[in-house]
Amino acid sequence: LEIIRSCDLIVLPAVSKEECYAYRIVGQVCPEISDMPLLCTPFPMIKDEKKLELAHTRIYETIEDYLRRGQIVGMLTIGDPGIYSTYLYMHKRAKENGWQAEIINGVPSFCAVAAKLGISLGEKKEEIHIIPAAYEVEDTFSYSGTCVYMKSGKIGRASCRERV
């Protein structure tokens, strides 16, 4: 929370603060965020690499304008920024352009769910697979261990079977 409070600008990967889940979560523990300058910028969830690259470049250039003015910029994201996160696209560009950038870890949703349920995702030699479900996933149904399907809103119902 100290880092959020130290920012001159908070980037929200959404059309509006009302639609930003990360903003709503942070607002519960840091109500002063509602008085901070915000930049709402939706990140497209598309597979067309050229369009995605153009969108990320446009978003980064907007953020870099603030950095050039000497502002401290933070970006909210849900889960952990290192796991299929929109933040990493900006982080890489900032580092490539000589800016100081820091990744502040969070709690991935699948870890939070396992903790809430009181279960382990993997023990001893059990494998844990994290799979981007927005792509082809059929081959992964035979993986041993625990499979975590991220970004799964578009895969519909998957066949589940209990392993013995």
Task: Label every PLM stretch briefly.
Residues 2-6, 68-69, 124, 140-144:
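Flexible, charged surface loops at secondary-structure boundaries
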Residues 12, 37-42, 103, 123, ...:
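Structural signal for conserved beta-strand scaffold positions within catalytic alpha/beta enzyme cores
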Residues 16-17, 134-136, 151-155:
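Short beta->alpha connector loops
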Residues 51-60, 116-119, 142-146:
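Short, surface-exposed amphipathic charged segments that create phosphate/polyanion-binding patches used
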Residues 71-75, 101, 145-150:
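Generic beta-sheet signal
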Residues 140-163:
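A contiguous loop/helix-start segment that scaffolds small-molecule binding in enzyme catalytic cores
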